[in-house]
Amino acid sequence: MKNKFLVVIFLLLFAFVCVFSVDTFYKYNYPLKYKEDIIENASVFGENPAFVASIIRVESRFNPNAISRRGAMGLMQILPSTAEFIAEGLGVKNFFKGMLFEPSLNIKFGCYYLKFLRKKFSDEKTILSAYNAGEGVVRTWLKDEQYSNNGSTLKTVP
């Protein structure tokens, strides 16, 4: 009887440690910072908050001060030239590229741009490719049978 009690205690303790470890692992490796901004802006622009958070995770690892080799800035890694286009579309006055380091604005701009791309492309792979490589580059890929079977979706990303 005593052995069964010890086994049960051990199993409960083991289960607790496993659950705690998994939770800690995900919180460390997949932090959900800026949750309110992500949910609010994803909702405004018709995006899935998890989709937006995953882009932020891949693009900047939730670092609001990230700058890529190509000059993309902030959480969602937006190029200043793209940001100027977005600022105009959103009616943001006196935009300057340093504003891209402001998490709330960067998430708003990124969600706006995703909505813009969603109107132009029909599937997630093509939308994400356009977000990363640029709309013009993706249009070139779509014309190439090596990358697209139908001219509207990518079968592979170069």
Where would I find each of the regions flagged by the language model?
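N-terminal Sec-pathway targeting helices
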Residues: 1-17
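Export/targeting segments at the very N-terminus of extracytoplasmic proteins
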Residues: 14-64, 105
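Second-shell loop/turn segments in exported
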Residues: 24-28, 38-41, 64-73, 93-103, ...
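Surface-exposed patches in mature extracellular/periplasmic domains of secreted proteins
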Residues: 51-54, 95, 121-130
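Short glycine/serine- and small hydrophobic-enriched flexible loop segments
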Residues: 57, 112-119
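Glycine-rich, acidic and aromatic/proline-enriched surface loops and short helix-turn segments
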Residues: 58-61, 80-88, 133-136
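Substrate-binding/active-site groove segments that recognize
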Residues: 70-93, 109-110
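Catalytic and substrate-binding regions of cell-wall glycan-acting enzymes that process beta-1,4-linked
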Residues: 126-158
